[in-house]
Curated annotation (Swiss-Prot):
Protein's organism: Corynebacterium jeikeium (strain K411)
Gene field: glmM
Cofactor note: Binds 1 Mg(2+) ion per subunit.
Name the UniProt record assigns to this protein: Phosphoglucosamine mutase
Cited function: Catalyzes the conversion of glucosamine-6-phosphate to glucosamine-1-phosphate.
Family according to the record: Belongs to the phosphohexose mutase family.
Amino acid sequence: MGKLFGTDGVRGLANKKLTAPLAMKLGAAAARVLVSKEEVGGRRPTAVVGRDPRVSGEMLTAALSAGMASQGVDVLDVGVIPTPAVAFLTDDFGADMGVMISASHNPMPDNGIKFFAAGGRKLQDDVEDEIEATMLELPETGPTGAAIGRILDESSDALERYLAHVGTAINHPLDGIRVVVDCANGAASTAAPEAYRQAGADVVAIHSRPNSFNINDGVGSTHIEVLQKAVLEHQADLGLAHDGDADRCLAVDSEGNVVDGDQIMAILAVAMKENGELKQNTLVATVMSNLGMKLAMRANGIKVLETQVGDRYVLAELLASDLSLGGEQSGHVIISEHATTGDGTLTGLTLMARMAQTGKPLSELASVMTVLPQTLINVPVADKSVIADDERVVEAIAKAEEDLGDAGRVLLRPSGTEELFRVMVEAADPGTARRIAGKLAAVVAEV
């Protein structure tokens, strides 16, 4: 068995790579590993399990839940719900673990499984390694009689508990703000529009009718052009786009311009510093964040700490350094006072609260930073592990960095979830970024 866990749990084509038997084994192994790390004190251990609405979700939820129950864990099934809600409910219910069945922004045929430890935090790499090892040595039998775990339906008030929680994060009513929210026909479809309405916004919800098959189908945060058009059509103050599991948020201003995760973080960092809420005046971002954001933060007296890609690594740095804000260009934003993972709904609420507080349009708030032109090319490869050390790639990177000097940067890295190698170039003008990225991508493709 090859390595299962990527940067965001286990992910793959449902019923091909990610099968029901595999989900059952994962559930059983995770139950054994995570429960062994918690002081359950003789009580029955519990796990919160949620999913997005794609067609394979019910199958995988049933299989994973059966695996957990086979090891004596009571499963609290919270139904279709955002990933950050599962993280919150894991803590709110006092559960020993949480699990989200979702492939996030991936197409409908894919699915994934991501785990949360007690308290709602994503697992560390060493714990994931232990789960994989445990899968290879699972016993044939498990607890019997009353010691077998139960699968309990806890979906009736799960969403309401989450909405009540995120609603406490803002102090400014959103009255008068008209927002179009693209729910990607995913887990945000009920949660995000309702959260924004409860806060006072005038909400136009689009792509909010999941039917098991239409999640991420030409909509949501990976198809932002759909939202750009809708914002102009509805004459809205802004638009917010979520992905399939609602852990990310991208925005569009009233003029139809995209406001990405870097810009959202810059807006929130300046706001939190102004309000005395930005611990150590420091923001956590990843190596993929735009150089323009880092320059803007420096100009505003805010330090930027960098991590590798993945909101789990952003969170790890937030915890290790006792910081309050971090995230990714893709729209995963973590506000550590209120969340343990990226939360698209919370991000949208907080962004609109800043608009309400200042009375400024999103376009003006976003001008806090100048986005350096960036080109990202995803190159399909046969073996991600050999690219970075290939002599041709090393030489091409050195030449590109020499050409750019201090006016840009180059970053090559493997995808954590797909057989791709990502080539990213930032430069002073779009043409230069495209030209250099194209050359690098061609070299990578030849390896």
